[in-house]
Amino acid sequence: AAVSNTILDWAQQREMGFSYFIALGDSLDIDVDELLDFLTRDSKTSAILLYLEHLSDARRFVSASRSASRNKPILVIKSGRSPAAQRLLHSRSGMDPAWDAAIQRAGLLRVQDTHELFSAVETLSHMRPLRGEKLMIVSNGAAPAALALDELWLRNGKLATLGEETLQRLRDALPGSVVPDNPLDLRDDASSDRYIKAITILLDSQDFDALMIIHSPSAVAPGSESARALIEAVRNHPRGKYVTLLTNWCGEFSSQEARRLFSEAGLPTYRTPEGTITAFMHMVEYRRNQKQLRETPALSGNLTANSVDVHRLLQQAIEEGATSLDTHEVQPILGSYGMQTLPTWIAGDSAEAVHIAEQIGYPVALKLRSPDIPHKSDVQGVMLYLRTATEVQQAAEAIIDRVKMTWPQARIHGLLVQSMANRAGAQELRVVVEHDPVFGPLIMLGEGGVEWRPEEQAVVALPPLNMNLARYLIIQAIKSKKIRGRSALRPLDIAGLSQFLVKVSNLIVDCAEIQRLDIHPLLASGNEFTALDVTLDIAPFIGDRESRLAIRPYPLHLEEWVEMKNGERALFRPILPEDEPLLRAFISQVTKEDLYYRYFSEINEFTHDDLANMTQIDYDREMAIVAVRRSGAGEEILGVTRAISDPDNVDAEFAVLVRSDLKGLGLGRRLLEKLIGYTRDHGLSRLNGITMPNNRGMVTLARKLGFDVDIQLDEGIVSLSLSLISTDKQE
């Protein structure tokens, strides 16, 4: 209530209205995801502002947020980042980096405090969408422009570079004391006329994506006079309604009237240069999150895994009472998912360690094997670069003696012997998977250390990952200095590390028994990534294996090989984000008439965003099944059927489309039958669709499959409806 009243009070002073202002309290009757679904469908709502303390269902929240953010911007402020704040709020809201990962993955924008919140609300209320990230700054003084530049630099923003034509026009139009550059300092004697000349020239150019105008109190150009002139110039310029504009009229009393004028004109205005940059970077971050949400992932190559063998190994270990597996035991598990580990042998004592070292060759590494000591370094339990039998024997005895002295209660299960990895020019990384109480498994990337503090040392992502999401995580880690972008000799192979992270993600998605995974160090050497030391914590898992994940993974169990009438086989499978190029090629082989039947309008071309929305789906709310055939060039899509359910998972709208040259092979029927089976198993009650009266093939197929067919000639449509509830359940 306190935050709500603060926002309302601020909005009243700003004369800003809300379509709805809803406080959920303890969410006993309605939850955040239901509210998001309602506001997404509401045409009066242009942007959504959320204040959150906790979540009751992370998966439903992420699902609803991803759906809503495709249509309108959503701002989130999350309290309870510190343990003390969580105690005050009586909430167990999970790790703060997990919230960042979920908010970014859903395409939302997080603000950190109420000051940023009000700034962002101002931005969303008035600012036009960004088309890029390059900022142009105009000011009547160097000092405020410098403050803006510093804040832009701190936030990794981009400054626009003016073209030579624009620079020359500015030289010709402005006094010699004004140096054409970015920022453009019009000097403290700048009149309203000088402002308008410069801004008109800039509006004529295409050199920037957003324009920030700073005005410091001046007797030469009073604030309200300059504001009126600017509003008029922007309104009259052909590009005025397309340019992203931010205004910063500094001061308080002398700028009140100017800020009121900007607000009435629908132009965002801020009190300080730093606040203006913060608002701009909010929109940049939001744009990046949305771009990430729609970017087509690269193919990840052959990432097949023998999950059956891995499940057997994990189950066997659990039945034997194991709760933690070390590098030697984890080796076949990671190997089944294509991850390379350093060959490891177990030695019972120093003599056996020497024997193994003689067999594999020097130098070797020797490591303690104990389930009771979480960090080997606590007892100096790792000895490297041992080059002789004497060194191995002495190191082994020293490790065991130290444990007996410092950890007398610890069990010693021998020693691990490894060939010494070639670390020359290599980079040491750390990949950790931990379970968050709210969002489930989290994948963390950093360089780590003995005291692992993921909030400070790592970037975090939610599984499942594809190549794009993994690449974004790595770039985020480099930019935030959690990892280095190169070793002493070579740059980090981002594509190779992305593939490794995707493999880790696949392992975690497949194996609910895994409670924690710690790969430290992961040695990055060129395009090779080798796990030197691994710890895997396991426990029995009972229940729905997918329910522990905040995002539903690819439903592999729906894949099915189907024989067509011509004897060829096609793979029926859920659509993937990587299918965008295949879907574009498929649509190019569908006639305009068939596309008109499907979309009820003439389709010239689908944009990238259109295709991204069709391929990057939320499997909890939507299902698209494609029929795929192997061809010389790889794969090709032969047909697709789709069902989009309502937020309550009661009804779903369906459609089906087959390549025009492949009709008569039974593809449409087989695809629709599979979709009916899926929606029924998914708990839906009814499947609905619309087609045209002259689409006789679809009408006939619907009748054969038991749909109720309602031909409405006056409306020019045919309504199709199928009950998915069995007669027994209805009775």
Region locations from a protein language model:
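Catalytic-core regions of core metabolic enzymes
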Residues: A1-D533, F541-I542
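Long, contiguous binding/interaction regions
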Residues: A539-E731
